[in-house]
Amino acid sequence: MAGEFYDSARIFVQAGDGGDGAATFRREKYVPRGGPDGGDGGRGGHVYLVADPGLNTLLPFRERTRFIAERGGNGGRSRKHGRNGRDVFIRVPVGTVARTVIDGETYSVDLDAPGLRLLAARGGRGGLGNVHFATSSYQVPRIAELGEPGERREIELELKLLADVGLIGFPNAGKSTLLSVISAARPKIAPYPFTTLQPNLGVVEVGEYSFVVADIPGLIEGAHRGVGLGFSFLRHIERTRLLIHIIDAAGVDGRDPVNDFSAINEELRLYQPALAQRPQVVALNKADLPEAQANLKRLRAAIPVSEQDLFVISAATREGVDALLQRVAERLREMPAPHRAPRDETLTWPVPEVDERLYTIERTGDGWRVRGRRIERLISMTNFAQPDAIMRIQRVLEASGIGAALQEAGIQNGDVLYIEQAAFDWEDGAITYRMPGVS
């Protein structure tokens, strides 16, 4: 993997507001009282995340973190429909997990196939023009809707590598050296722990068979709690099909190789029990050192893997490396290949469907607050400067049963009714709009 790796980011996305509907009337020479002809506003632009196989890092989001879509155009005379706002497409690497909080709950979507799209923020609906409000008894509607506000989201992005094989082991066990000799990858290599601070990918070819190997940053005890490079390490092996567990058989850092094997598997189990069951091939590395040769008999007896999955190697001299790769290729062929074919599909946040007609009423310090998707959307799309706006809200309160429910709850004359950002004075079942700043 060339360049700098960046595997998490936080962005803000804002979909476009819908355009306003028009409250206009026909003006014809011989029709002095023409009917309503106001057109609808256009939809606000959506914001999408798109899985792009050509990307491998979230680094661009270090520089740019805000994405705002275009507002829809306003409606016009002669039923002219406003133009829809342009959508925004944000490209992310395949394997990116997006998370956001909606109504206090966290939802996530996994963009694990090329071409997958996530509708991250939905553009607002265009406001209706006054042609929609004309009836036989209301032939001159002086009302049109404002555009619905577009959705706004704070989104956390996390990249989980899509590799077939993960190289795991304590820092300085030789993972980067092994990757450099089995592939064209050139990770930073040095004789001290934590040389690898970011994942590296390499493509390995065994005959006509090839697979992707990820050299993951080294693990230490407590990684499942985020100690050291813990989370950076563990999240990237979740998608691998097989692990090569590299052990410093020479114990050059003063640790016991058997304890190393047990400690890393325990960290896998504590982070995610399924990871501890992931197939492993064990490589006893640094066999070119005398200390390793002295430990081999004990290690073979103590490490609980089958003989065919235990290899003595030297990444520095390539001793035993070819046999190791043959076995890895053999194991991978036996496993079902992951389905990563392109998918032309649009996903949405997995929010449970809620009946928009539902509402709640609660007592506040000086009045009452009504909450509900449909009634709150109506308020947000109401232009209170229009003469007939309050009349429409009054009708909706009565038809929906909210007015009766408020009276049953105990609302009194003079109480204040709050819906969305608007406030109304209540008097004998009728509402009067409170101008902002007026008490």
From Swiss-Prot:
Keyword tRNA processing: no
UniProt main location, coarse: cytoplasm
Residue span(s) of domain OBG-type G: 163-333
Annotated Obg domain residues: 3-162
Keyword line: Cytoplasm, GTP-binding, Hydrolase, Magnesium, Metal-binding, Nucleotide-binding
Protein EC: 3.6.5.-
GO biological process: one example: ribosome biogenesis
Binding, Mg(2+): S176, T196
Entry binding sites for GTP: 169-176, 194-198, 215-218, 285-288, 314-316
Keyword Ribonucleoprotein among record annotations: no
Needed cofactors: Mg(2+)
One GO CC term, this protein: cytoplasm
Family matches, as SUPFAM superfamilies: Obg GTP-binding protein C-terminal domain, Obg GTP-binding protein N-terminal domain, P-loop containing nucleoside triphosphate hydrolases
Subcellular location: Cytoplasm
Sequence ranges assigned to domain OCT in this UniProt record: 351-428
GO molecular function, one term: GTP binding
Entry function: An essential GTPase which binds GTP, GDP and possibly (p)ppGpp with moderate affinity, with high nucleotide exchange rates and a fairly low GTP hydrolysis rate. Plays a role in control of the cell cycle, stress response, ribosome biogenesis and in those bacteria that undergo differentiation, in morphogenesis control.
Family matches, as HAMAP family: GTPase_Obg
Oligomeric form and interacting partners: Monomer.
This protein's name: GTPase Obg
